[in-house]
Amino acid sequence: MAALSLTGCVKDELFDTPHPGKGSITVTADWSARGEGIATPESWNLSMGDYHGTETAATHAPDHLFEPGCYSLVAWNPATDISVSGTSASVTSTADGCISGELGWLFTSVQDVTIEADRDHAFTAAMQQQVRQLTLTIRLTGDAAERVEGISGRLSGVAGTMDFASDTYGAPSSVALNFTKITQGENAGAWTATVRLLGITGESQQLTGGITYAGDNLPSTPIASDMTALLAGLNENNTVPLSLACDLETPTQAGVTATIIDWEVQEEVNADIK
């Protein structure tokens, strides 16, 4: 009897990617939620698990492969006077005991993602603007208005930190308001200060400061204003600058604090500043 020889066939398992046990990612940053006139940042950072990368293009495709599982994908851009650790942003302190009011434009994105083995994943990081611009304009009236040499101030209740994963604000701080005189345009003669803030926090926001005059005959005038109600919505709608203006009569006697009560929201006005 002839011997019968049987040959067995082994079928190779087929995979969809060169990394069957892990997953890859491609992340595209969406910068469309920017305020008017704000440029797309030159670079941005991405953190996911034990991976950290920096990108200058719109899309980041790292060589790094990820184990299957759930991750938090965090993206942000470097911004002047803001440091980021995890999902916490902190504002730089200044020598006068305040925090910086000259922040760069910070954008962030946080999302939970799931990585599957043997799969290439494509994600979009919708970058949200986290810094809002605030402008205060004081229109001076009264006999001493033309003698005003300078206006200085501080705004309290400003957020020194923010957790952009939970949208919570902390570290109540003050920011300096450096008013400059407008020399042309609709508000010529008024004094204005512009700051960029992460947000507000704490129970109240108070403006304090002083008006100084040319010459030695008139002492400086303290100024004060409770801004709490006016700034209650500052942490929302960051892409739209907030501009507030008021009329303030210069006091005619020494030792009187000029209290500002009636602020009004104003449209953005182009002006030349001295």
Write out the residue ranges for each language-model feature.
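Short, surface-exposed binding/anchoring microloops in extracellular/periplasmic proteins
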Residues: 128-156
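Short structural boundary motif marking the start of a folded domain
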Residues: 21-27, 71, 132-134
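Conserved "repeat-terminator" motif of extracellular CCP/Sushi domains
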Residues: 19-20, 124-131
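Structural motif
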Residues: 27-41, 137-146
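Bacterial Sec-dependent N-terminal signal peptides
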Residues: 2-32, 264-274
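Eukaryotic extended interaction platforms
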Residues: 248-274
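Structured interaction patches on ligand/partner-binding surfaces of diverse proteins
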Residues: 80-122, 216-253
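Tryptophan-paired
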Residues: 39-89, 149-232
